[in-house]
Amino acid sequence: MSSNKINKKSIARIAAVQAIYQNILQNNDDMDDIMQNVLSFYRNDSSITNLTGNLKISLSISHFKILVKSVFENINKLDEIIDNHLTNDKDPAHMPILLRALLRAGIYELLFYPTTPAKVVINEYTDIANDMLNGYEIGFVNSVLDTIAKEKNKIS
């Protein structure tokens, strides 16, 4: 990147995955508390500077909040969609937490953000997966999101 700046929606997506992950890990239903914890990290300049050097990072707070709240309002439907894309030999209970968090956010955006092109959503979440997951899981994220994008009209 030439500008040392990352798109605000990209950062919001990463932060949303972090909040969703934190919810699963802590089994904490207080989403407002979780969102405030994640937002406080991104608002703390010293936290960000230590991780990024001179890279400018800020997130779209509105995109973050809408995405996180909407995922939790639709969590059962999203988990059903995820579980339906597992092969018969995969137990949904054994899916890695981070993988489930990322898929929840990505699937929600594919199904309920019609103004964002599917290709953008797939690329964004595959990039996030590339930074957070292993090779098989990255391919799985790409495959599931691509399949859902193609089946979108049947699902939503």
Swiss-Prot record:
GO terms for cellular component: cytosol. GO terms for biological process: DNA-templated transcription termination; transcription antitermination. The keyword RNA-binding applies. It comes from the Bacteria. GO terms for molecular function: RNA binding. Keywords: RNA-binding, Transcription, Transcription antitermination, Transcription regulation. SUPFAM superfamilies: NusB-like. The keyword Amino-acid biosynthesis does not apply. Signal peptide: none annotated. Pfam families: NusB (PF01029). Involved in transcription antitermination. Required for transcription of ribosomal RNA (rRNA) genes. Binds specifically to the boxA antiterminator sequence of the ribosomal RNA (rrn) operons. Belongs to the NusB family. This is Transcription antitermination protein NusB. It comes from Rickettsia akari (strain Hartford). The gene is nusB.
